[in-house]
Amino acid sequence: MKKLIAVLSMLALFAVAGGARAQDKDKAPEKAAAEAKAEPAKAEARADAKAGEKKQAAAAPAQAAAPATPKCGDKGFDCNKGDIAWMMTSTAFVLLMTVPGLALFYAGMVRTKNALSTVMQSFSIFCVVAVLWVIYGYSVAFTAGNPFWGSFDKLFMLGEDPATAVAATFSKGQYLPDFVYCMFQLTFAAITVALIAGGYGERFKFSAMILFSILWFTFAYLPIAHMVWYWDGPDAYTTAKAGEEAAAHAGFLFQKGALDFAGGTVVHVNSGIAALVCALMLGKRNGYGKVAMAPHSVMMTAIGTGMLWMGWFGFNAGSALEATGAAGIAFFNTLFGTATAGLAWTLTEWMVKGKPSLLGICTGIVAGLVAITPAAGYVGPIGAFFTCAIAGIVCFFAVTKVKSWLGYDDSLDTFGVH
């Protein structure tokens, strides 16, 4: 019985297979007819594809001959979007240093009755310098003129097209929009003038302070900035002869080989000396040495210190002008070196006075930030460590000993720290 069922099953399978073959044979003419109808359409599609390829081949030489559209700048040099974003961020960071960072740092160190006027000084100085910088400051500091003074070619930024006006970086063929670089340098000028307030704190009338700021910005800051930082950019140094011509247009100290990565000379030495001169010319505050003049809010000073440290990353790392390894090492040194200086000041104060203080570590941190500024992009970790450690110790004695020995009243220790 099982054999019979197996035989019947095999016969059924053969029958199904035979029927399928018969259906395929019946459909074969239909498939052939359909393929015959589709063949003209396929041939037409192939012809269209070949025609398209010929058109592309004919257009290729024309595309190759067409000039490339400039990405940025009237000479077609490249402006990297990442660099632009980094520089605008750095500009905002440096703004944070002055308002409210420096304003709070200084306000906490004066007496209560002078706190608001001290904050007002920082804000008003920033506004005055910002306006003057756009009117004539940027043009004087960063255009070709003579080794000590630029020109007036960019007054009010007139004639500058935001789409094409560029400023050089430190890499050939890499540029920044001129308006971005102008704003970055504006924040440097503003904080430099504001720093001097530490030398005349609690002694200047508002009107006298404004007049002094305008005059000092014009006749002290701008020439120094031009002498140290102005040059034609790396693309001007194509040959030895071209390099000589470009060097002749550079600032006086730049020609002499001065290296100032982020403003050790232009910002800190400049403002520190000015603060000392102000302190000596104005004389001591009424009651100095007889009446207690302790800081009214060290907590406010500590908050200002934190904002200064935060903003200083834009100050130092932003001075690389590109988001490159130079910016990275400057960022590293600004953190590591500053911490070293704060610790060095604290340990020195602990040994000399018997206990550390919050005001002391805040001042040590600022001393470290100042010390690493000119070398931030030039030294490695070891260089940053020793530079800032020495600065923390030296500035401690400059503030606590040298000032009393020489007898000047530098209200907020601008000279001793900067």
What are these model-derived regions, one by one?
Residues 1-23:
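N-terminal export/membrane-targeting signals
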Residues 4-5, 23-417:
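Hydrophobic alpha-helical transmembrane bundles of multi-pass membrane proteins
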